[in-house]
């Protein structure tokens, strides 16, 4: 379960780099939205993974 949390965290970091790097206005907005979505998913899976132990 923590493996999924790590995967979501890496995806969130990639989305942040693309979103906050100033690549394109449309892509940046999409990346910012994805960043927050994946951060929430990361936190949920992290909590669930810790709760299972």
Curated annotation (Swiss-Prot):
Alphabetical list of InterPro entries matching this protein: DUF1328 (IPR009760)
Coiled coil: none
Location in or out of the cell: Cell membrane
HAMAP family the UniProt entry points to: UPF0391 (MF_01361)
Major location (coarse): membrane
Keywords, alphabetical: Cell membrane, Membrane, Transmembrane, Transmembrane helix
UniProt record similarity statement: Belongs to the UPF0391 family.
Name used for this protein in its record: UPF0391 membrane protein BPSS2216
Bilayer-crossing regions: 5-25, 30-50
Pfam families, per database record: DUF1328 (PF07043)
Disulfide links within the chain: none
Membrane topology category: Multi-pass membrane protein
């Amino acid at each position: 379960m923590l493996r999924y949390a790590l995967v979501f965290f890496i995806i969130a970091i990639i989305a942040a780099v693309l979103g906050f790097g100033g690549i394109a206005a449309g892509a940046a907005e999409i990346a910012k939205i994805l960043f927050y979505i994946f951060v929430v998913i990361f936190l949920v899976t992290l909590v669930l993974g810790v709760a299972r132990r």
